[in-house]
Amino acid sequence: MLLQTIPSFERIGDYATNLEELGEKLATEGGSFSEKAKQELEILTTAVREILDTTIQALSENDSELVKTIEPLEEVIDDMVRLLKDRHTKRLKNGSCSVTSGLIFIDALTHLERASDHCSSIAVLMLARDNAEILANHYDYVRHLHEGTDKHYASELRRRREQYVDQLYKL
């Protein structure tokens, strides 16, 4: 199972490199983000740091309970990215953000979201190790979770939305 996680960790590293390059591009081109965009990005990066830390901890400690907290957080990160892309598109349309900075912001959101997607993949691999049904069809497992019929998942999802998405709405 550990070998199966290597490609996901490699991709996460690639996204980190891409984010660094976006930061360099923003600096070289003299671009900047609005204060609101910076605040939004800070909330999102906090969530992504948490999912990365949780994934590493769950894997290193072989913690099957901790691993179950990853998918709800990943779904919340997806929700946050959708919201932030919509907000940023409005800023672009009303001229409060330059095209260059706006595209960099959107690219950064995409890289952060994809890193969290790989954390979800690692979590599913960990759960599949002890569950033949998940191993046989992990897509059905994730779809079932997203349908909201798992009480633990629904509770964790609600908690994570309160923790992160609510902060975005307060901005």
Residue ranges and their predicted role:
Residues M1-L171:
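Cytosolic, long alpha-helical scaffolding segments
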